[in-house]
A protein has these predicted regions:
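A conserved acidic beta->alpha catalytic loop
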Residues: 23, 38-47, 65
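Cell-envelope/extracellular polymer assembly enzymes that use nucleotide-activated donors
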Residues: 3-5, 33
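Short beta-strand/loop segment that forms part of the nucleotide-sugar
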Residues: 32-40, 59-63
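Glycine-rich, basic loop-to-helix element that forms the pyrophosphate-binding segment
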Residues: 62-80, 90
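Conserved donor NDP-sugar-binding/catalytic core segment of glycosyltransferases
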Residues: 96-133
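Short aromatic/hydrophobic "clamp" motif used to bind/position activated sugar donors
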Residues: 85
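Short, acidic, metal-binding catalytic loop of nucleotide-sugar glycosyltransferases
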Residues: 23-31
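Active-site beta-to-alpha loop of glycosyltransferases that engages the nucleotide-sugar donor
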Residues: 8-19, 29, 40
Length: 135
């Protein structure tokens, strides 16, 4: 069993998906499964995703049509066989310590049920895009 399952929903992410996946595989924490759920991409991103299918910890779900973000995410979650599930957008890029820090935070207290990263804007790196929500 993996420590984390990372789910990336994708539709027409040709310009970002490969770099997004590569940033996940560059993590210092390697105890994860990566699931990409493709929602009927018509660009080259589906082929980009298929190029990772030989990796043991990679799963690709091909929907053929756009079933929507929530459905795609739920498909990935349904296949999760790990302690944690991590949602990751197809246009996001992670620093090498990202997953290790998320898991360390989640493990710090049994009362923690959700964690979120500080997201920095890609082209305006001095600006935060999202800093989480209070639940």
């Amino acid at each position: 069993m993996y420590k984390a399952t990372i789910v990336i929903p994708n539709i027409n992410g040709k310009g970002w998906l490969k770099d997004s996946i590569e940033s996940v595989y560059a993590q210092t924490e390697q105890n994860f499964r990566l699931i990409v759920v493709d929602n009927g991409s018509t660009d080259e991103s589906l082929e980009q995703a298929r190029s990772y299918c030989s990796r043991e910890n990679f799963t690709l779900i091909e929907n053929g049509t756009n079933t929507g973000f929530s459905h795609a995410v739920n498909q990935g979650i349904a296949l999760a066989d790990s302690e944690y599930v991590v949602l990751f957008n197809n246009d996001a890029f992670a620093e090498p310590q990202w997953l290790a820090e998320l898991l360390r935070t989640a493990d710090a207290d049994p009362k923690i049920f959700a964690v979120q990263s500080l997201m920095i804007r890609h082209f305006e790196r001095e600006l935060a895009d999202d800093a989480g929500d209070y639940v």
